[in-house]
Amino acid sequence: MFSECSSLQSINLSSFNTTNVKDMRWMFSYCSSLQSIDLSLFNTTNVEDMSRMFLGCSSLQSIDLSSFNTTNVKDMLCMFYGCSSLQSINLSSFNTINVKDMSGMFYECSSLQSLDLSLFNTTNVKNMSDMFKECKSLKIENVKVSEKGEKILDKFLHV
């Protein structure tokens, strides 16, 4: 929708009705000048795909997605890939029970300081490759994953 709007610095989305939206992939990808965005009124109840949603938003410094309902999301591939200025993300309400792909989700989020993944359920995740690659400043908090997910996640926490 706003993909490759490289001059976009901020946007008012308060009048957007996203109630029937199922696909948000690439929505803000490569908005390299985007510094802030308020998505608190987004209704994400029916969304199934959030892959590459913020890919390449290299000027974005923080984002609060605590209002997102992610129960039906299946794909979070490269969701924040290349958000190199991103220091904080509020994912406190993320329910990932149906997600199958988290590969590259935080790849190259080199300024990201901490993540609270307390609601992340990785039972159905098939791919976590490069999930935290190049996240040199990252401290992960409150991780609760399945035994299978723990083995997969441990492999990618230290890259």
Put a short name on every predicted segment.
Residues 1-159:
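Negatively charged
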